[in-house]
């Protein structure tokens, strides 16, 4: 399960705020997606995250829920065995099986690994190209492939599936040089949900018996 949370972090390891100038159509699509997403306050998504490596015969899947403040580093990720919290200053990683929560400072630098940026994964460090449309049921998805500007990166390709009508990322697939494929599939997307600010911080009073390891 620790592999899964590490893999989830990999999904958002290449983020921030400037586009690589490679494909005008892809750029226009992503600009619309970014503009719409950043118009929201708090977004809630239910997702499936899968780590797949056929050669190593590894396939792990985890269901989860993400609450994220679209224009900040505040988020909560809830999965079966782990939870992540961030109030923008501190980050908590709660390991349920170990009854332990690790506290660290948030890295607010542009290249920081941050689940809050899952829907803006494409915004820095990538070249990208529009590869066409695919249909699934009644929906049409715009497909965009990204490759890192830095060829030394472990991830060599990212594939985005964007719901054409909703202008939202529906699926992110990452491919790394070790043969791993990471898939983040959005099952539900609920914008502007009302949650208290306390959602984004770990409250030890609600978790009796949990050891707090402060790494700050």
Label for each model-derived stretch:
Residues 106-139:
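Flexible, surface-exposed loop/linker segments and immediately adjacent secondary-structure boundaries
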Residues 1-7:
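Positively charged n-region of N-terminal signal peptides that target proteins for export
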Residues 131-133, 137-208, 213-216:
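Gly/Pro-enriched, hydrophobic low-complexity segments
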